[in-house]
Amino acid sequence: MQWLELSVTVDTEAVESVSELFAQYGYNGGVAVEEAIIPSLDSPEYQIDTNKPVIVRTYLLANEQAADAQTQIERGLWVLGMMRPVGDLQVKTIAEEDWANAWKEHYRTRRIGQRFVIVPSWLEYEPAENDVVLNLDPGMAFGTGLHPTTQLCLELMELIEFNNTTVLDLGCGSGILAVGAAKLGSQRVLALDTDPIAVEATAENARINHAETLVTALEGSLGDAPLEHWLGWEGAQLGTPQSYRHHNEFDVILANILAKVHVVLGNDYLAALKPGGVLITSGIINEREADVVAAFDAVGLEQVERRTQGDWVAFTHRKPV
């Protein structure tokens, strides 16, 4: 049996979109994101060189379905290329005996913030004091765990108290935030996503991190709004994921999703939080920041923290007591 390695070089702001495209067609939704690094001369630590392009990879079984999947990926890249610089799709054939190591070589241990360390599950890592280690398997867009929107969330999470809290991770993706909350001391985490692949990935990553009794991953959304607000075009049909309605239930809500979704869910965030509860939001492009700020101000959420990285903004808000 043979495999096809598909790769494309993009700028940092296109990584998440290309990763989501590759996850739709790649084997088991697996995506590898290879960022340029600046190694340290004195330690195994390194920094990401954000000024250099990023390589995004996925893999296909070389069977009769591969040609159609490759065509769909090429079409998707063409559309994305209308908005951001996207390189040509590169395709390489890999023999079965080389497959096991071909995809693993593009993953490495990565420190985010002061405490979080993301470690591919097959690598060994000796944690330092106060490290919070997240062992993750590649699944739906694993590489987006390194995306600025996720980094901002993890950094903001380090600033609040999680011991004995009840947490909602909305749009859980790979489950990195849900598992992070559990590792920081949360007693119960509900992880919701409208994509069943994301729900499976979150459940698996919770298991790998021995957090399966703390993290519950379900397919669904939050509140009363129509579910089409989750996608980037109007009138999209998402099938029938359940819409969950919670009142004064969560100490913390984590939501790394589209800015337009944050705008729609302002009232639902407020309703779901306990008095004094904390909302961390990311996935907000600079151009949509004012919309999100206005929506949250309108419902009475109090801004506590604002952070930026590149073109992205993240917030911490609090529900009044």
Curated annotation (Swiss-Prot):
Keywords: Cytoplasm, Methyltransferase, S-adenosyl-L-methionine, Transferase. It is an enzyme of class 2 (transferase). The keyword Methyltransferase applies. GO terms for cellular component: cytoplasm. Its EC number is 2.1.1.-. The keyword Transferase applies. Its main location: cytoplasm. Methylates ribosomal protein L11. PANTHER family: ELECTRON TRANSFER FLAVOPROTEIN BETA SUBUNIT LYSINE METHYLTRANSFERASE. Belongs to the methyltransferase superfamily. PrmA family. HAMAP family: Methyltr_PrmA. This is Ribosomal protein L11 methyltransferase. It comes from Herpetosiphon aurantiacus (strain ATCC 23779 / DSM 785 / 114-95).
